[in-house]
Amino acid sequence: MHNSTLDQFGKTISLLLVSFLVLTSCSHKELPVSDLIRLNQIGFYPSEEKTAIVASDKGAYKKFEIRDLQTSKIVYRGLLSVSRSSSFSPKKTTVLSFSALDTPGEYQIEILGIGKSQPFVVKEHLLQDVTLASLKGFYYQRMSTPIEETYAGKWHRPFAHPDDQVMIHPSAVSPKRPAGTIISSSKGWYDAGDYNKYIVNSGFTVGVLLSLLEDYPEYVLQMNTNIPESGNTTPDLLDEVAWNIDWMLTMQDPADGGVYHKLTTPNFEGFIKPEDCQQQRYVITKSVTASLDFAASMAQAARIFTTVEEDYPGYSDKMLAASRRAFEWASKNPLALYRQEELNKKYEPAIQTGAYGDRSAEDEFFWAASELYVTTGEDKYLEIAEQIAPEQFTPPVWSRVAGMGCLTFIRYGGSFDERGKELANRMKSLLLDYTESAVRNLEMSPYAAPYGREAKDFFWGCNSDAASNQGIAFLYAWLLTGDKKYQTAALSNMDYILGRNATGYCYITGFGYKSPMHPHHRLSASDDIVEPIPGLLIGGPNPGKQDKCEYPSDIPDECYVDDQASYASNEMAINWQGLFTYFSAALDASLEK
């Protein structure tokens, strides 16, 4: 080859190289942000698994890069995995794994031909802020008090719902409280997107939050949610729970110990400010499930509040006495289930608000007996628990609370006598049977989480009652076995809730770059503020579509709409909030370095 030819060849190569560099530089700058790249919008822990999903078949795109946004340098390169699919969706997904990226910082994923992700962070204590916001959500749900700007910022509001003129509904009459009797039943939390209060759901929620304190006391002690009680000698979580317990205690009939099922208006209020509500409020008939959920949560609270007698003198004794009486009433009235339709045929006014009904109270009896046994040490409660102990573990939800009793026995099993230890060991085996089966769903799951592999995972409240409570079970399995796979599985479920999912939403209001703006939540809808109250877990995809709203898809994991009218997919509720608060706090505590 002649020298001139060599020179020309060299120039050509140089031009091509420059062109390539220019093109790649331009392509980086011009890459659009792609909604197809789904990840935990809060971020990642440095030493834990890191996974993102491309919500499409990878096609011709085989590589991805990660850019450090501080230095603008590419710090990681990887290959897209094989495509995944599910049995219920025609859509495919592709997994990106970058767990080796362990340096704290802010980053962005880039895939030529697809686009770039939103920026994300890698840092320690990743879930601390969302955990605090989730617990703070209960403060915003308080009633019978002004929500002050000092503690609530722009979401402050005036005093509403004193509940000091509550009427005994005809279904709840007793010799000493005839229909129309006025009682005071103030304080407590608004249950969900509505303005009513329900003992079944409150008792369950209190139990979940108290369990968090029992399981992770050091973490809870350092949680400061900036509420009026912050700075006293009591953890903020207990101060918050006490606000609701104060109300719950007023729901017990002093004559016989039974507990009213709920405090409610006949019909749901409109989307109006709480201070503008005018409907008469009633307490409705006593029920066995309300009495047992009350008994369980009061027994649990009684043993915990002994540690904060300075701020709550005599509180523990009061709660334990109330718990015993409620359990006795339930034992005498085991079939007193709440059946709203039957009540409405007999009494006026008809009640059309949340029923929180049940088909059996056996699981409530087990939970209540478990808590009373732990608190009192009395064998009569152990005997009851032994007789009705579940034969399989089910992650707890308000309507299936046997799992609460299982976790209580697991938590305290080491302090029991031989009989108690035997039952505790059985409960451990049931839990591990469940988690060993559930963790297998992580394999080839379309969004790389045990939750969400099957269509049955999606229903009313699934972000809590399928994803969060399963995550809690995984964390128990990790504590019991030390097997890292369970902790990883729990983190994967959290990744799903916080954005690595089929809709691309982070399902916590006020967090992430795409979160619900129009929840079915009267407090948020009526406050004349654009952003909803932050820190609230939204129910999530629900193919049942009970609200008859217009949904963007019929695919189960996409049946979600950010619409104020969508109570079936876009509401919050204290029971869901409680499970998520536990899950987020426990996960953050377990991953602390």
Question: PLM features: what roles do these ranges have?
Answer:
Residues 389-395:
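Solenoid-like repeat scaffolds
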Residues 252-261, 334-342, 377, 440-444:
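Proline-centered turn/helix-capping motifs that create local helix->coil transitions or kinks
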Residues 13-21:
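Sec-dependent N-terminal signal peptides
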Residues 37-114, 124, 136, 140-207, ...:
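Aromatic (Trp/Tyr) and acidic
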Residues 2-14:
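Bacterial N-terminal signal peptides that target proteins for export
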Residues 21-33:
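Bacterial Sec-dependent signal peptides at the C-terminal "C-region" and cleavage site
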Residues 236-258:
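Carboxylate/His-rich catalytic cores and anion/metal-binding grooves
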Residues 229, 233:
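Acidic, glycine-anchored loop motifs typical of Ca2+
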